[in-house]
Each structure stands twice: as C-alpha cells, then as structure tokens.
C-alpha cells in the first residue's frame, strides 16, 4: 500500500530507499509534521515510488522537502534454512553471530525490519556460513498491520 510523506529534496528520487527513524525535535512546530511522520512506522524500510514537483520549506532539510509516494521496500536478507518457506509470514530475529567482519553479517542482521514480513521468494544463491549454520538468502516484504 502506497503512503504519502515528505522527504528532503536532495533525497527525493524514484527508487531510493530509506529507513524511517522518527521525528526530530525540530519537527515539533512544523505545519507539515503530520504529513512527514504520521504515515510511517519507525524502523521500517521504504522505497520511493513517485516524486511530486512542488518544493516545501523545512528546517531540517537545507533545500526543502518534496512530496513523495512510498511503499514498504522488498529486500534481501539471510535467515535459517528451516524458516525459509515461500509465502510464510515471520517475525524477524537476527542470527546469533558475533563475526561482524563476515561478508554475510549485514544480510543476517539487516536494518529496517520491524514487525512481521512475508517471504516473497527464496533465492538460489548458496550462503556460506563460517559458523556452520544452514542459511538461505530470501526476498521479503513487510506485512501491513
């Protein structure tokens, strides 16, 4: 489902993704606060699907903000093989691992996942785990609640 929000003009490009972190103190007195923040969920990754041309003033973004349509982004993560079933709905939990230099670490500990998500596809790529875990790379989409 598409949502309307505002984002810094420099960042407002179709296809860009961002993780919504919540309002800043500077946002409190702004007349656009509701449009910027009420439609988004903290910790969720969004993809910009369209950008409108009008520019609006903003105390946070130097070059103002633009109205954009966003939707929760589909993205790739790594999970335990036993949980990797196409179409299933899961709540994400990071894989227990302290090897931050591992090439898979960021995919095993992704940012921007909050709440439940649906496994949209299981990718054929082989995932090598130095700790011996059986892992799969999957594409996910957030489940709207």
From Swiss-Prot:
Alphabetized InterPro entries for the sequence: UPF0179
Protein name: UPF0179 protein MmarC5_1728
Family matches, as Pfam families: UPF0179
Protein species of origin: Methanococcus maripaludis (strain C5 / ATCC BAA-1333)
Membership in a protein family: Belongs to the UPF0179 family.
HAMAP family given in the database record: UPF0179
């Amino acid at each position: 489902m598409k949502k309307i929000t505002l984002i810094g003009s420099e960042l407002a490009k179709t296809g860009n993704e961002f993780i919504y972190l919540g309002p800043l103190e500077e946002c409190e007195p702004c007349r656009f606060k509701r449009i910027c923040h009420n439609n988004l969920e903290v910790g969720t990754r969004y993809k910009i699907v369209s950008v409108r041309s009008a520019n609006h003033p903003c105390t946070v973004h130097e070059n103002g903000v633009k109205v954009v349509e966003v939707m929760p982004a589909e993205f790739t993560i790594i999970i335990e093989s036993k949980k990797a079933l196409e179409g299933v709905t899961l709540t994400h939990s990071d894989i227990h691992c302290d090897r931050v230099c591992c090439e898979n670490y960021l995919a095993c500990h992704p940012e921007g996942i909050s709440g439940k998500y649906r496994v949209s596809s299981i990718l054929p790529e082989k995932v090598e785990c130095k700790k011996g875990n059986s892992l799969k790379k999957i594409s996910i989409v957030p489940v709207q609640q």
